[in-house]
A protein has these predicted regions:
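Surface-exposed short loop/turn segments
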Residues: 59-131
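Contiguous N-terminal and early-domain "leader" segments and peripheral loops that mark the onset or edge
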Residues: 11, 20-22, 100
Length: 150
């Protein structure tokens, strides 16, 4: 019984995160792009998101080319309150972000666009607010794979 309780607590401690896609204009592709790279707006948080997306592309063995440009613009980033996330949980003190993603082909024609809202409501020791960028980056990759872009 104690083992199940500990497992439950561990799962509870690391959960509480999610993403939501909206304003999606992302048509299903007939043919995958040969490569992709992310380029985000010039500020510290956007550059962190850019790095995370490019790391995931590399992990997926997607070549870093300009065939598909993933342009990201973090519209909102709220770090929330780590202490409240740790002490209260259940979404209190949540870190949130809202990001616009635009996709361009190598001729710089827009081929898709969508927005992502990400939330991190809890985590071990309150979680790091920038983990919300991890969820955003992973959702970008998930959407591109689901629509056969990569």
């Amino acid at each position: 019984m104690m083992k199940k309780y500990i497992i439950f607590l561990l799962i509870f401690a690391i959960s509480g995160c999610g993403t939501k896609i909206y304003n999606e204009n992302l048509p299903q592709q007939n043919q995958k792009y040969l490569g992709a790279t992310a380029k985000c707006d010039d500020n510290k948080i956007n550059k962190k998101l850019e790095t995370k997306i490019n790391e995931l592309l590399k992990k997926e063995k997607i070549p870093a080319t300009n065939d598909l440009s993933i342009n990201c613009n973090l519209l909102k980033f709220d770090e929330g309150n780590r202490a409240v996330r740790y002490l209260i949980s259940f979404g209190a003190g949540a870190a949130t972000s809202s990001t616009n993603i635009k996709l361009y082909n190598k001729n710089q024609n827009i081929v898709g666009e969508f927005d992502i809202n990400a939330t991190m409501g809890m985590g071990g020791f309150g979680g790091d607010a920038e983990e919300v960028l991890d969820f955003t980056a992973q959702e970008v990759i998930n959407r591109l794979k689901a629509k056969n872009f990569i």
